């Protein structure tokens, strides 16, 4: 290893993607060290066990690769900058995306600063399925090579400066290749399943978890025609387009179509439902977004044609974007879209390049 080798701190989660990222960076000649982040203190037994197992797996991988593993506690930052906002959004009847917030405030802010200032890193690296490319002197965020795993939707808040300081080794690979590398290396994480659930809080029963922090208020479920057909256990447990968990499966309105959530009346604590996943009340012709983040950090004015995702794993939607003011845009879809959800993120693309995005403030309903 040359003395001039750049130092990279890899965010080690105890999963297969970060494990293979560390090895790939070693192969590329970087001086590699790992960092395990603890971001949640409200430990119940089950969560404590999961975090302990993840740390043990991260340590086992680092031992196998012959690299040092640091640990850091960002629980206070997570609570203040991610979790409290997450709760406030749910309380207001919106559906936030904690993974996006967590990337913005923890992985590419607290971690990036800690790695540079405390550990002397030249770069950080994560196991995200995205790529970076330099265009006109600025780093761009590109979709991951594996379209099934692309995670650019969750990283749209990053600036070109943050991307320039970050490496994404598995973004150039497909998931089966990553697992095969881990198996060939004999890493304990090779067959570990991908984590789901709230960022850093792990997999747990969501209703039960949310109910600890926000008291649920039961209320009426009514149809779009105003008929009361059931009771919900709390508006915060429901999101637009939701079909399961409504408890009204046996009630039919002269048709066999299932019921879907089409709106939430937060003021009166009423859940509004309709039958059919393409009911006009569920469709939107566009949206208004705010809290904008453009990767190039250039202010957006005028209009542009691009594509948008209003949720993860959605097929790109062709659209026209128009600036309303410095921090608000209007987005008009080429075709109506179902279940556009306030609180979620709208993320914009020009081909492979992620341009940035914003929070959906309101949807523009299909005129009925």
Curated annotation (Swiss-Prot):
Stretches the record annotates as Interaction with tRNA: 149-151, 311-312
Q: Example GO molecular function term?
A: tRNA binding
Swiss-Prot/TrEMBL catalytic activity: S-sulfanyl-L-cysteinyl-[protein] + uridine(34) in tRNA + AH2 + ATP = 2-thiouridine(34) in tRNA + L-cysteinyl-[protein] + A + AMP + diphosphate + H(+)
Assigned keywords, A-Z: ATP-binding, Cytoplasm, Disulfide bond, Nucleotide-binding, RNA-binding, Transferase, tRNA processing, tRNA-binding
- Return the EC number: 2.8.1.13
Q: Does the keyword Metal-binding apply?
A: no
Q: Which cysteines are joined by disulfide bonds?
A: 102-199
Q: Give me the ranges of the annotated region Interaction with target base in tRNA.
A: 97-99
Q: Identify one Gene Ontology CC term for this UniProt entry.
A: cytoplasm
Top-level taxonomic group: Bacteria
Decide whether keyword Electron transport is in the record. Answer: no
Which BP terms from GO are recorded?
A: tRNA wobble position uridine thiolation
Enzymatic class: transferase
The subcellular localization recorded is: Cytoplasm
Q: Which InterPro entries match?
A: MnmA-like, MnmA-like_C, MnmA-like_central, MnmA-like_central_sf, Rossmann-like_a/b/a_fold
Residues annotated for ATP binding in this entry: 11-18, 37, 127
SUPFAM superfamilies per the UniProt record, alphabetical: Adenine nucleotide alpha hydrolases-like (SSF52402)
Which residues of this protein are annotated with the site description Interaction with tRNA? Answer: 128, 344
Q: Where is the signal peptide?
A: none
Tell me the protein family, please: Belongs to the MnmA/TRMU family.
Subunit note: Interacts with TusE.
Q: What does this protein do?
A: Catalyzes the 2-thiolation of uridine at the wobble position (U34) of tRNA(Lys), tRNA(Glu) and tRNA(Gln), leading to the formation of s(2)U34, the first step of tRNA-mnm(5)s(2)U34 synthesis. Sulfur is provided by IscS, via a sulfur-relay system. Binds ATP and its substrate tRNAs.
**HAMAP family noted in UniProt:** tRNA_thiouridyl_MnmA
Q: What is this protein called?
A: tRNA-specific 2-thiouridylase MnmA
